[in-house]
Amino acid sequence: MLRFAPSPTGDMHIGNLRAAIFNYIIAKQQNQKFLIRIEDTDIARNIVDKDKEILNLLNLFGLLWDNLVYQSSNFERHRQLAQHLISKDLAFYCYCSKEFLESKRLEAKEQKKPFRYDPSWAEIEKSSNTKPVVRIRGASEAISFEDAIKGTLRFEAHEIDSFVILKEDGIPTYNFACAIDDMLYDISFIVRGEDHVSNTPRQILIHRALGYDKVLGYAHLPIILGESGSKMSKRDNASSVAWLLEEGFLPQAIMNYLISMGNHTPTEVFKLQDAYNWFDIKNIAKSPVKFDIKRLRFLNREHLKMLNEQEFALLLDSKDSSIGALGKLHLQEASTLNEIRSKIERIFSPKCIAQNEEGENFENECKILYDILHQMIESYDESLNDYDTFKNALMAKSSLKGKKFFKPLRILLTGQTQGLELSEIYPYLRFFLRDIVRLSK
């Protein structure tokens, strides 16, 4: 079984989603089940309904799970196993206060040594009112594991001291809950961010202490950098999956991009299901990869092109395939649904005919064309059915030509002074002329 284990303490970012996608693909390739484990052990930081938001996003991306568990439902089992380790002298109570430990950290810093917990401190403050935590005994030998991306990773015994597995309130720490739940659900392979590399030997230590000898596979993904080259932070809008969706990027385009980041793919544009045939986690680059919004925009445009007109219309909140066709036409100059919606909204909004951004004024010409168009629409003039016939009839009736004809006509039809060729767009606009040709008051 493979798993994706999000925490309901914040928004899902693209690094989380990338890990979820890779775990899901590998589960499909190996015909294994896919587990979602909500890691809600940090009770103070859990955000109400954030778990539902995460699950809705996973569902939207088509990452359908076979099992769903909440880590908190296993708290009693975690406590039982902590007591088991204590009974075997593989874990112990520690009564050290936060102040005592902080003083030891400062000592180590002054001596320019790495801080390492000393088990002999455990009962120094036992007579005080300090509630004890439970610590697992540190490693007695080096711990190594194979990483599908980074190769063999080795941690010396002195790097893995006696760390906390149960807090003073009896809540398990992240590493303890994670290690036990991976055992309980028979997880075989874990794909996660490289910020978890230092957690892996600790989780292996817990497995060994509990007599769990299954060797898990690991792949730690390199971080994603912002366009500036620095690590992406929560302040980077593009790091948020919700923001990308709100901007009008399709789930299938986002997945396409995240799978191809730092990877060799047989084609530029593909769907999630295509990746089942060729994806190999070992091909993911070891070094950090820079987020490229231009690349994502390109892929989004390509995935929008793959939609039929009815599908496109539904994404634009319309049931009329002509609106979908209009949207597809705008892919010549737009890449996201928001950009296309904006252009179509301008078409159907009352038109402002005052001076435009270039300082040009076609107010008189717009009024002349508006009056003629209004008459043609009301009389169901047959010349409206074909662009060339329509253009010639309107030009003859208005006595306007050149720039003084085409720019005001474009303003009346699209609300803009530049854009697609009117001959391309008119076949789709003609069905809506009564709604389109309106002036703002």
UniProtKB/Swiss-Prot annotation:
SUPFAM superfamilies: An anticodon-binding domain of class I aminoacyl-tRNA synthetases, Nucleotidylyl transferase. GO terms for biological process: glutamyl-tRNA aminoacylation. It comes from the Bacteria. Its EC number is 6.1.1.17. A motif ('KMSKS' region) lies at residues 231-235. The keyword Aminoacyl-tRNA synthetase applies. ATP binds at residue 234. It catalyses: tRNA(Glu) + L-glutamate + ATP = L-glutamyl-tRNA(Glu) + AMP + diphosphate. One of its GO terms (molecular function) is glutamate-tRNA ligase activity. Keywords: Aminoacyl-tRNA synthetase, ATP-binding, Cytoplasm, Ligase, Nucleotide-binding, Protein biosynthesis. It is found in: Cytoplasm. HAMAP family: Glu_tRNA_synth_type1. Catalyzes the attachment of glutamate to tRNA(Glu) in a two-step reaction: glutamate is first activated by ATP to form Glu-AMP and then transferred to the acceptor end of tRNA(Glu). This is Glutamate--tRNA ligase 2. It comes from Helicobacter hepaticus (strain ATCC 51449 / 3B1). The lineage of its organism: Bacteria, Pseudomonadati, Campylobacterota, Epsilonproteobacteria, Campylobacterales. The gene is gltX2.
